[in-house]
Regions:
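Helix-to-loop junctions at the C-terminal end of transmembrane segments
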Residues: 61-73, 277-289
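Paired small-residue
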Residues: 88, 99-107
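Helix-loop-helix hairpin linking two adjacent transmembrane segments in secondary transporters
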Residues: 140-187
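Structural signature of the two symmetry-related core transmembrane helices
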Residues: 76-90, 292-298
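Cytoplasmic helix-loop-helix junction between adjacent transmembrane helices
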Residues: 105-142
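Extracytoplasmic
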Residues: 10-44, 62-65, 229-236, 244
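Residue-level signature of mid-helix packing/kink "hotspots" within the transmembrane helices
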Residues: 27, 55-63, 148-149, 271-279
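Extracytoplasmic gate region of multi-pass secondary transporters
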Residues: 29-33, 211-281
Length: 298
């Protein structure tokens, strides 16, 4: 009988931590919509455009960082992503115009690409055994949802003690601090020399000729479209739609004392449900046909 390989390897644990921190920050941006717009008198559309640019940069950046990881190594790609992420947050903290905020959103978006699913899941998948791969990928994906669970409430809590600019600076420091765990992330390189020498154009042409890739691409597009809209606007929507939270009520008694805190908790609940769904999908993916399972989810 072959030796039983561990599910929770150092690569998986570090990968989960990096994704969790990265997505905690990303999921919190909707919390800042009202304070930033109120301070500078911006329109909601101006803030929304910055979030849209950030998501666009995240999408464009994922294949770029995938190529960087294959050329120079996963850990170096993650470092580049984290540095861009932190710089984008620091510059955004000093921005006073919508144009500046939108320009720096490109850096933040590319930073998310370098520290998010595209790079991390590839490393986790290579490091996992065949038996554990499906569950390892599910756990790493669920770590992103775990970041969403605490990211927005932490941002809202920090806003009660400091300005949104200082919260951005704090998040930038957290992004850089997570790099201290990188030495533990080592995974075998499986690409051969011919694959490494392929250009980005060749890889994209090959990918889009595969019907399975195209269907998965469209599925991710629909998922990302909805998720991006919810994380950007749902906290502000809840904050402005709900009436004041009265002392003695159920919400007040469990620590939710303002509508802005309720908006942050609403994002957390979505992330919590996502964790359950992701882990369930990972468990089911080991036992049932993945393509039919994915079709059923959509």
């Amino acid at each position: 009988m072959p030796p039983r390989t561990s599910l929770f390897t150092p690569v998986l644990l570090v990968g989960c931590f990096i994704i969790m921190v990265s997505f905690a920050v990303r999921a919190s941006f909707g919390v800042f919509q009202i304070p930033i717009a109120a301070e500078f008198g911006w329109l909601r559309t101006e803030f929304s455009l910055a979030i849209a640019i950030q998501n666009l940069a995240w999408g464009v950046g994922q294949p770029i960082f995938g190529a960087i990881a294959e050329k120079i190594g996963d850990r170096k790609a993650i470092v580049i992503g984290a540095v861009l992420y932190a710089i984008g947050l620091v510059l955004s903290a000093g921005s006073t115009t919508p144009l500046e905020h939108q320009a720096y959103a490109w850096l933040v978006g590319f930073g998310i690409a370098g520290t998010g699913f595209g790079v991390i899941l590839a490393v986790v998948g290579r490091a996992a055994s065949d038996d554990n791969r499906s569950m390892s990928l599910a756990i790493a994906t669920a770590a992103g949802s775990a970041g969403q669970v605490f990211g927005a409430p932490v941002a809202e809590w920090l806003l009660t003690m400091m300005s949104w600019q200082m919260v951005f600076m704090t998040f930038a420091a957290a992004i850089m601090a997570m790099l201290l765990t990188l030495p533990l992330m080592r995974a075998p390189v499986t690409a051969n020399k011919a694959e490494l020498e392929e250009s980005m154009g060749q890889i994209l042409v090959k990918a889009f000729r595969d019907p399975s890739f195209t269907l998965i691409f469209l599925g991710f597009f629909s998922c990302g479209y909805q998720l991006g809209f919810i994380t950007a606007h749902f906290p502000a929507f809840v904050t402005e739609l709900c009436g004041p939270i009265l002392p003695g009520g159920v919400l007040h008694n469990i620590g939710i004392t303002s509508t802005s805190a309720l908006g942050a908790v609403a994002i957390s609940l979505i992330g919590l449900a996502n964790i359950v769904g992701t882990l369930t999908a990972g468990w089911a993916g080991k036992r049932f046909s993945k393509k039919y399972l994915l079709a059923g989810i959509y």
